[in-house]
Every structure is written in C-alpha cells, then in structure tokens.
Amino acid sequence: MQFHERFDVIVVGGGHAGTEAALASARMGSKTLLLTHNIDTLGQMSCNPAIGGIGKGHLVKEIDALGGAMAVATDFAGIQFRTLNSSKGPAVRATRAQADRALYRHKIQEILQHQTNLRIFQQAVDDLVVENNKVIGVVTQMGLAFEAPAVVLTAGTFLGGKIHIGLENYSGGRAGDPPSIALAHRLRELPIRVGRLKTGTPPRIDANTIDFSLMTEQKGDNPLPVMSFIGDVNDHPEQVSCYITHTNERTHDIIRGGLDRSPMYSGIIEGIGPRYCPSIEDKINRFADKTSHQIFIEPEGLNTTEIYPNGISTSLPFDVQLNLVRSIKGMENAEIMRPGYAIEYDYFDPRDLKNSLETKAISGLFFAGQINGTTGYEEAGAQGLLAGMNASLQVQGKEAWAPRRDQAYLGVLVDDLSTLGTKEPYRMFTSRAEYRLLLREDNADLRLTEKGRELGLVDDKRWALFSEKMESIETELQRLRGQWIHPNSPLVEALNPNLNTPITREATFEDLLRRPEMDYPKLMSIDGFGPGLEDQRAAEQVQIQVKYSGYIQRQQGEIDKAIRHETTLLPLDLDYQEVPGLSNEVIAKMNEHKPETIGQASRISGMTPAAISILLVHLKKRGLLRKSA
C-alpha cells in the first residue's frame, strides 16, 4: 500500500539522532517525515539522565549553534547544572546537566510537534526500497510504503537488539521496546560491513530505600550555567543534589562470585562494550588492584523516586545485582525498581560512509547515531543533525557539507569515524581534538552559527541574538584596544592597587586585561575603565580572546599550514594501481578505506608522507586537483 504523500526526506527512528535529523531537514525547508515505532518515546533518554560533560558538552553547544534542540531541551529539563574542569583553561571546561527524563522528553516532543515541514508517523520500518543503488523509500511493518529520495537511518540499539540479564536473554531494542529484526536482516543484505557492539545500563533504585545521610552530597553550581546560547537560567526547573558513594571489597567479592553467570564472561555476549563506560564487572576484572569505585547517585526526575546509580552498569543475574547494590554504603536496604541489563546490537562500519554520513554504496541513504558505532546522546544528536542537513542539501541539489577537524568537535567525530572506523563504541573526548584551544564550548556559536544561517538551520530569533552578541564583542574589543592609559593618568591611582606591578609605560586597556592577575570583571569595576558588557557570555568571550590571543594565533597558523591539502578531493573512481610509486600496502589501505580527501588519507594508520606526496603529484599531472567546499 502506497502512502498518499511523497516526502523529500524520511528519518527512521526518534531518538537523539533521529529527532535532530528530522528537525534539521525540516528547518532547511525539506518536506520531512519522522517514522518512529512509538510517538510517546520520542526524545527518550534510554540510559543515564544527563546531558553534556567533557567533550560531550562541546558537541551539545555545537548542535545548539547550528539551531538544534538538545541544549534548549536540557535548559528546560535540567535539575542540576555543573561546569566541569572550571579551574582549568577554557578549552577543556564543559557543561553537564542532570536532566528530568519526563521533562526532557516532553520538551523534545513539543519542539518536534511545532516544527513546520515535519510530519510524524508511528510505524516500525521493516524494509528499504533501493533501485540502481539509490534509495527511493521505505516500507513499514504493516506494508505501508513511503517514498523519498533521501532516507536517514537512526535505529540506535534496535537493529538485531538482544537484551541480557545473567544467562537469560531475549530480543529487544531497549527494556520494554521490541527490536528491529526485519530491518536488521534487510541492512545486512547491503554492501556495507556490519558488526556487533554492546552497551549496558545499571539497575534503577527506589530513593525511598536509600540512606542519603551516609553519602557525600554533590550540589550544582551557583550561579547556574545554561546549556543553550539562547537559554536563560529562568528556563531551569527546581534544582536538586546528586550524591556520591563507593563500592567496597565486599561488593567486589559479590561480583566475582557471580561472574560464572555473567553473559560477558561466559561467552554469550560477543559484542564489544564501551571502553570509557565499562560495566562494574568489567571494572572489577580490569582494575583488580582497586579496592573501591566511585558511584554517582543521580535522580531521574522531580516527580519520580527512581535513582540512577552511575557507575554500576551490569548484566549480572538479578540476585547478584540486588546483593551488590545492598553491599554499598547508604544502600544497605535498597530496593531495585528496574534491573540492569546489557544489550547487543548491530552497527555498520562507518568507514563505508562519506563524511556527509551518506553511505558510499547507496545514494541517498544516510546513517546517524549508534548505527555508526558511537555511544552517547550527544554524539548521536550531532550526527543526526549533520545527516539530516546533508539529506536536505542533497534533495535540494546542493553540495554536502561537514565541518573540518579544526572547525568543530563534530568534524573530529565524523572524520574519526569515516577515516579510521571503530571496533568499540566511540565516545567523544577533548583529547581527540588536536586544535582544542579553538574548539571551546564558549565559542561554538562564533564557529558555526554563521554557517548554520547560510545553510538554513538557524532561525531569525537565534540569528538576531547571535548578531547582537557578535557586535557587542567586537565593539568592546575595539574599545579596549583603542583606550590608553599612561603612568601619569588620574586613573592610575585606582588601577595600581589591583596590579602585581604598577604600570611604568603607556598601555591599552587590552594590555591590562592580558596581565595574569587581571580579569574582565575586576578591570570593569575600577573607576574609569567600565562599565563594560552586561551580557556575561559576551564578556567571557572578550576576556578569552584577549588573554589567549597569542596561543590562538599560533594554533591558527598551524591549522593554515595543515589544511593546505586537507580538502583536496580524491576521485571516487581513481585506480590506485595506476598511481606510479605507491606500495602494495598503501594501495590496499586506500582500497579498503576509500578516503574522500587527501586529509582523510593522511590519517589512515600506516599512511606515509611520501605516499601523500605521490598522490598529490599524480592528481596534479592528471589535472585532477580539486578541493571540496
């Protein structure tokens, strides 16, 4: 049965990747359909009730800078906000919010339902319709066919999903939801490499059975951070505390005693789990010398007693889960409301994707989120936005776009995946970015919002606020650079007590701000130097740009040198056997990875500078030197 309307873009899946993909495509004017197996679970936080953190918070800010929904929803749902690494430099500072699951889901659904050009339909997808290596639509569980020249697949952990608790297992996409078995079989027919990964979640605890007085309270920051560049602290709901406790040697003995019934250690689970979010049984095994592990006791919302014990993800049998929970300080009488479990699922090798997240094998088919081997809401949301945007661009006959590694963490994420691939769930860290001084949370809008506006992702309200902020920053920087003070100035009397050494020669206000002992609020509070900017985010930007200007210029110089050939395109039909001077090893690597650019080729493990030079000479001789947009 054919659906009565045709769409430009179809998005399959309504998690963090799917919602951002659908919203991005619709914002850009494409007639978009979001297909989900359950409208009520759109925007569901399937695992931990938190958004942001080191590396992840940077991605959220970038999604926001491009007009996405994640940061806005977090501001309306966040019940505790903290700035991590606040004592360190701005490059590694990151915002993290504890979120109320219900409020977050509600806000995402509200944004989806009010988005023009977006239709939502509840049906699981069982089949892709492909003709001549080009996608032309999908078919749902009940045989309803939808047509579109671009399809974005964001199936999360649902493809061939299998849930494990102890030695018992059953098919599922997550607890309470069915898996996508038919679609998984269909995708395995495509010429795209497939593998299995695993992730897990801890048991949920009833707060009424926890003794919080035996734990360490962890309050949020004051003043409260905001996640979105257009957000306000007044958007935040009531704020609550988290708590910290620890496992102990008794806990570890209980876990060791249950390993013979662990699906991970009995060989039942074959998928590789996340290195940076291991199960508690994996921690005990890998770090056998540690006598305790930290656990964060996180509320799941304001109107629920469910607690998420972050740090004890497990797939051990229920009786072992209960015993290990009750061995932990403050949880001696705890009751489990939902058992922890592990889930195995299909993922597809992201090296088979272009950096637009379109599959190389099937034109018009895009993958985003855990299907590409990543883990985390933020990584999924960022990919979803990029895939939805590029699906829309393709339908409009425009060239695909993806940020470079020096432009965004999203650029690092996509380049890592499409160039290097992954054999374990990929998680973003600031350490993955070589140009992290330029890729800060605070300047994500300065880096990306103008491009987002050009692409049609950024609405008038966000653009007006951004333009006002940019003008404020530029005007204030010009003022600081243009105003001078000399040793005999009447302003010196008020200034010198705030300096480590009095000024002895003429200096601009910018020179004063560059001093280690001076910051922008202090300088503006001194008579004759203020009043300065009222907008705290603009003021922060002024301070960072002044204090780090030398380092920023140096890093920009490195980038300018590095990107000289970064975007030089490698023709898809280039026969590497015909390139004189390439070793058989390099030819094999190029044929396996199929890089789109010289930059991607240079990051393939084992690729030599000599091989890159040979490729460039060959392209030049053949008149094939072209750069991507």
Swiss-Prot record:
One of its GO terms (cellular component) is cytosol. The keyword tRNA processing applies. Signal peptide: none annotated. It is found in: Cytoplasm. The keyword Flavoprotein applies. FAD binds at residues 13-18, 125, 180, 370. NAD(+) binds at residues 273-287. Belongs to the MnmG family. This is tRNA uridine 5-carboxymethylaminomethyl modification enzyme MnmG. It comes from Shewanella halifaxensis (strain HAW-EB4).
